[in-house]
Amino acid sequence: VLSLLTACGDKTTPSDGDDQTVTDENGSDTDNNTDDTTDPYDAVRSYWSEDQLTQAWGPDQVVEHLFFHPIIAYPQWAFHDCNASQDQRYGLDDWMVTVDEYNKILQSVYDKGYVLVAMEDVWSEVTDESGTHMVRNTLMLPEGKKPLIISFDDVNYYPYMLDEGFTSKLVVGDDGEIWAQCTDPYTNETFLTKELDATPILDQFVYEHPDFSLNGAKAIFSLTGYQGILGYRTQDDRDIAADSPDRPAFDAYRASEIEAVKPVIERLKETGWTFGSHTWGHIRLDTKPLQTVINDTERWADEVGSLVGPTQILFYPHVGRPDGDD
């Protein structure tokens, strides 16, 4: 996929974060203002009419997949000024992109004629005489468009990332849209922004280019569970015994985080985002015993799937695809 993209420059942005949108703590602004009865995303969902979908994209044709991790909001901090080791900085360089790079990539794939499609439109589960299995569907696309799936690994906002120039969580603002919470590493000012995080950036890009989405499709969050999801610490701590004096306070905090993330999940689903598993513990599936995989899968379903809903999508951590049929 990378060969399809234009060069994205170095690991800096012109302002290193100075162009962020600073708002009140509830995320109020004037973007996408609508009345109480109209969802602005309706215009995206309905942009392509059925009679415009004249190009068949068959099962033998490639559907490109472009994946990201959370993007770096403050590259100067991440690559030069934070306390990360050199190896950690190399890791950021290998696996992450900056806000500036991300914006250029979105513009590049859009300019090349790609359109976002939903994974469930590409594949279907069928049961026939040979059993239950997945089959590729034929997509109907606008003439001249090519299908693209975008996914984001580890949108959990792990604590280590908060010290390395990333945003910290997703929230729903007063405008009903998704914002990111961010703390400026130089001033310690905490604010909401739509300009420094991959999720609201893609949201805004699709609002501005509704032809970039087929039937309102957006992207997939590939989530672990061991440090919560979407910036909320929803994970259980099984090291705290049921009769521990620390248990009531932990359970109360976890319950508050679970309630806080629910409206975020709801709005993401309403606006074309879907969810997949990256395993609960980010484990290598090709090296773990089957029972470990079963236990991990059950814990993901209990702590993550119970919030985002069931999924048929699994993203292999470390590209560790297991062999065999288990």
Identify the function of each model-found stretch:
Residues 31-32, 60, 136-137:
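Residue-level signal for protein termini and structural transition zones
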